[in-house]
Amino acid sequence: MARGHRSQIKRERNANKDTRPSAKLSYARVSVQKACFVLDAVRGKDVQTALGILAYNPRYASTLIEKLLKSAIANAENNNGMDVSKLYIEECYAGCAPTMKRIKPRAQGRAYRILKRLSHITIVLNER
């Protein structure tokens, strides 16, 4: 069955696109569990408060998420023309990425597998 002209299909697909400003960090060298600790602290907060929380958070993931949040703010300002003072974090989540497998030699000829976990971190902003 014909679904319509190619340009019409494209138009319909673009109409359903999410226009909220966002930023995604792929293959971040931090586990999902550790990233979620930091993301839970800033979810739903306005961006200035979130930047303050991230600046004084001692976890390694907070530095990655702080840079990602600044990128999302810049996207909102430049691409969407939004006011920075009205922005807040609507969604933030971390998903699994491929795991790097490494071998650590142990006693009596054994080899233990070390899993270096990666994650994909996404932040979506919106205006209040």
UniProtKB/Swiss-Prot annotation:
The segments labelled Disordered in the record are 1-22
GO terms (molecular function) for this protein are: rRNA binding; structural constituent of ribosome
A Pfam family of the record is Ribosomal_L22
- One GO CC term, this protein: cytosolic large ribosomal subunit
Q: Which InterPro entries match?
A: Ribosomal_uL22, Ribosomal_uL22_bac/chlpt-type, Ribosomal_uL22_bac/org-type, Ribosomal_uL22_CS, Ribosomal_uL22_sf
| Compositional bias of kind Basic and acidic residues | 9-21
Top-rank taxon? Bacteria
Gene Ontology biological-process entries: translation
Instruction: For this UniProt record, give its keywords in alphabetical order, as a comma-separated list.
Output: Ribonucleoprotein, Ribosomal protein, RNA-binding, rRNA-binding
What does this gene product do? This protein binds specifically to 23S rRNA; its binding is stimulated by other ribosomal proteins, e.g. L4, L17, and L20. It is important during the early stages of 50S assembly. It makes multiple contacts with different domains of the 23S rRNA in the assembled 50S subunit and ribosome. The globular domain of the protein is located near the polypeptide exit tunnel on the outside of the subunit, while an extended beta-hairpin is found that lines the wall of the exit tunnel in the center of the 70S ribosome.
Check the record and name the PANTHER family matching this protein. Answer: CHLOROPLAST 50S RIBOSOMAL PROTEIN L22-RELATED, LARGE RIBOSOMAL SUBUNIT PROTEIN UL22M
Binding partners and assembly: Part of the 50S ribosomal subunit.
Q: Which family does it belong to?
A: Belongs to the universal ribosomal protein uL22 family.
Protein known as: Large ribosomal subunit protein uL22
| Species, as recorded | Lachnoclostridium phytofermentans (strain ATCC 700394 / DSM 18823 / ISDg) (Clostridium phytofermentans)
